[in-house]
Amino acid sequence: MAYRKRGARRETNLKQDDRMQEKEENKNITNSIENKSTAKTQLSEKVLSQKEEIITDNQEEVKIADEVRKSNKEESKQLLEVLKTKEEHQKEVQYEILQKTIPTFEPKESILKKLEDIKPEQAKKQTKLFRIFEPKQLPIYRANGERELRNRWYWKLKRDTLPDGDYDVREYFLNLYDQVLTEMPDYLLLKDMAVENKNSRDAGKVVDSETAAICDAIFQDEETEGVVRRFIAEMRQRVQADRNVVNYPSILHPIDHAFNEYFLQHQLVEPLNNDIIFNYIPERIRNDVNYILNMDRNLPSTARYIRPNLLQDRLNLHDNFESLWDTITTSNYILARSVVPDLKELVSTEAQIQKMSQDLQLEALTIQSETQFLTGINSQAANDCFKTLIAAMLSQRTMSLDFVTTNYMSLISGMWLLTVVPNDMFIRESLVACQLAIINTIIYPAFGMQRMHYRNGDPQTPFQIAEQQIQNFQVANWLHFVNNNQFRQVVIDGVLNQVLNDNIRNGHVINQLMEALMQLSRQQFPTMPVDYKRSIQRGILLLSNRLGQLVDLTRLLAYNYETLMACITMNMQHMQTLTTEKLQLTSVTSLCMLIGNATVIPSPQTLFHYYNVNVNFHSNYNERINDAVAIITAANRLNLYQKKMKSIVEDFLKRLQIFDVSRVPDDQMYRLRDRLRLLPVEIRRLDIFNLILMNMEQIERASDKIAQGVIIAYRDMQLERDEMYGYVNIARNLDGFQQINLEELMRTGDYAQITNMLLNNQPVALVGALPFITDSSVISLIAKLDATVFAQIVKLRKVDTLKPILYKINSDSNDFYLVANYDWIPTSTTKVYKQVPQQFDFRASMHMLTSNLTFTVYSDLLAFVSADTVEPINAVAFDNMRIMNEL
């Protein structure tokens, strides 16, 4: 509908009675304005009347103008919102870019679960022997390529897997070594893995299920000699009870036998007795009179345990690894928070606020600043503050303070906080801001001194500057204490601990704080109004009224911190963290004002849980370091150092469970590599690698994907008959061929010799382990796909991507009839040099393995300890006085 503009001509066909009606309506409206008492009746008449109303153009236009104004306002509002969201989005993008170098963390529950899920390795029971090889039946082929009914047994690789793409055989051995390290058992108890030999005459047992399966398959093979069958029927365990020894028969490849013999002779289990369990409990927990520990159980002589690997500071992650250190401290903080006890029987929030209101005489005052004293005080905040302080100190996590300068009560509570918590625990910017607020709001005004103008970047903190300027002994004395409040580094039971000052531990420092506060409240505040002075005095009065409770709170804080600290096994290195834990000063006020008289101490079960999680993480950390160091050494020996280094370090971090590896900056990765490279290799891991290194050729021979070399010729060579495969392009020896070492060729890059030989029509043998692929299609052989090998050498000068094709043409191949029916002699320009795998010989593969008849490995030593506490109200601190004296 189009609206008319102002002064537009009215419609001429309006009826007279309509105009009269309009006049009457106008009259009614004017009457209603004059006589308000009759407004309701006229309104009801208007609503109920049948008469129609006509709205004039002028009125329409006014409405439209209003709508336009409104819409303009709304559009401008929307535009502002769009701009705001754009700015916020840009900030988010910038934040995300920043986050790439600062690690982000998962929800707290998941980190806690990851930590608690790290269990000692011995919990995984070994059910089978370690094996690289397994015997397989392979068919035999006649001279014409047809398969015989007979089979022959060979040792083949159990996991014969090479990844696709450009691949070096040496990487296969590095992965094999990694796999051996992962599966390497800490102990082997053959009795636990032994299974029944189905073919035994007298229900004998063999060492494991795989040995039983091999025996079963050989027993059922028609070509097995009768003497072997009789031997299998006699296979059983031999027990020497007097020596607590049992011998089990096993079927193993000689290399596998060497591995398992090594594992049996180098087991990590040690005898377990009550003394070991007693000494396993942290000494400070044993000597703490608040905990009553009992060991009722007498352990059997066969009890064993695996000593946790608790070496200290081999990588020094606190030094120059900001992201890694931040992640470790965060996970430690979350774990510590979960074990700090909850405060009990806090003073009723309502009652305390009412009492504070009375002390402040708020009813008689209208000063806004004093009503702020009561904001944010609640029991939840008090409990949260208690947990945050202890957990941050246990994990050495840096804190930042959040406060409002006009809330004097927060600042006075902050004075207590700075008294009991060492300065190092706060990020410097936050510490300086808080100290400056205390000085310019409370201390300097009290003595009529001018405001402190602090220069950013000043090496001295505001309190250090103030200590030199203030003449009052008590205040200067308190400032001196705060400025020198640092952790003492003490080594206890081989672990570096960050210990609080003795004056804090026994609570005496609170008297020093109160003396300073009372001196401040007595000052005249000469440059400030009376109301200001009164507000500060009342804030100090509120805190000083709770002197006894504050002493108790300080003692309680110190006791819980030190008791839980006894359960930490890694050195407590102090270093500022990338991210911080926020602490509201109002929550500190809540803690100071609501702390009751109930003593809370960690339960023994909580302490043991905290200790176990710390031990398991620390032990796993050291074991993973040993693995990483061993693999770095192996990569170096296999000339893969440059290629694999970053992935080795990434795997190391992943296995520690708590790290988000993708967010760790590269510079820290390479620094970590340099630290790992300097560490010595553990002897067991080195011996295992030497075993693999000595037997590389045997392992290559057993693989269906690794050749020992390739022969390349300019002219085609005939496929030869082989019993194992039929017609194949395999060379079993290199007699008569000119040989070039593949490793030498890759290292020197001198291809002139090989190119000249090929162009002069002389076959050349490249000797060295390299991967190959198998093809049994006759059509692909006709297509001469193997020419690509020649092209790679002559044109591309690339040996690292060399992957020859092994052709197997026999009665199992597709289109074999082409060869058989047409007497076609297939040829190839390449031959794969492949040695025959080791034939399975039952007599040579039968080994007797010896282990203890029985022993029991206990992983949780603290399960034998029953523990209880004295009534918390009677709990005493280090000075043999009750923790909480103000009862």
From Swiss-Prot:
Report the SS bond pairs: none
Regarding how it is modified after translation, the entry says: Sumoylated with SUMO1 and SUMO2. Sumoylation of viral proteins seems to have a positive role on viral replication.
The protein's site described by Interaction with the intermediate capsid protein VP6 is found at: 231, 235, 846, 848
Cite the record's Polar residues compositional bias ranges.
28-44
Region feature Hydrophobic, mapped onto this chain: 401-421, 429-449
Q: What is its main location?
A: virion
Kindly list the GO CC terms recorded for this protein.
T=2 icosahedral viral capsid; viral inner capsid; viral nucleocapsid
* Pfam families in the cross-refs: Rota_VP2 (PF05087)
Return the Basic and acidic residues bias intervals. 9-27
Family recorded in the similarity comment: Belongs to the rotavirus VP2 family.
The function of this protein is:
Inner capsid protein that self-assembles to form an icosahedral capsid with a T=2 symmetry, which consists of 120 copies of VP2, with channels at each of its five-fold vertices. This capsid constitutes the innermost concentric layer of the viral mature particle. It encapsidates the polymerase VP1, the capping enzyme VP3 and the genomic dsRNA, thereby defining the core.
Subunit annotation: Homodecamer; each decamer is made up of two conformers of VP2, called VP2A and VP2B. Interacts with a VP1-VP3 complex. Interacts with the intermediate capsid protein VP6. Interacts with NSP5. Interacts (via N-terminus) with NSP2.
Its protein name is Inner capsid protein VP2
The species this protein belongs to is Rotavirus A (isolate RVA/Monkey/United States/TUCH/2003/G3P[24]) (RV-A)
